[in-house]
């Protein structure tokens, strides 16, 4: 019996064998480890889920960097995101492979992406072929905002003047200057994670991202965007274990108006948690076996 290549979504293969990045001691990581509050998500290596241990004490305030900014460094997971990894918009009715959920959209109030007619058709076509077409089958990075609600955890490092985000999934990395500099890439350069620059507005880190390509989906259901999408993210610390995350997407080619997602990020409290090596092999035969066993037909590699 063949093993499916996929975990929670098509194209997911985690190989937990080699430590990818050792955690460096920082001002925001000196709290003694304890059992997890939300669990560590998929992937990673830690000291177990702490079954039967006492609950954590109340969370304290965020620690500060040397320049007085909130220290966001540590390991994080998207928590209570309404099943956005399956489908970011409201999906109250289960579909094959997709459990129902409220999604993560808070604006518009109906919880749906305000598509133009052309891109609504693209999204429907993507869902109809998602087992064969999902970009992660080709080892693409997830892009924004999809990267933020993946089932795998990520690490934040905060050297002076920067925020670095390192995901286990696809080994995606974002290096974000936080000095409010202008965007530096020409319009013709389009990336999976785009060109991100940040600035502090009080306690909130605001990250502005342009220059995204159109080769990623917003979720595993095939919701889509164009190469004109502009994303503004807001990271607002609540306490030492919680960051409120919000992102607004504006795309005049794909959407009739901007729309916004919002959900909390929870600090990973597993003892000795580490991000692990991740392997994704485009064209792996298990992908074709999975597609065939679910009644689909494997397609050629997307150029």
Predicted regions and their residues:
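PEST-like low-complexity, intrinsically disordered acidic/proline/serine-rich tracts
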Residues: 2-303
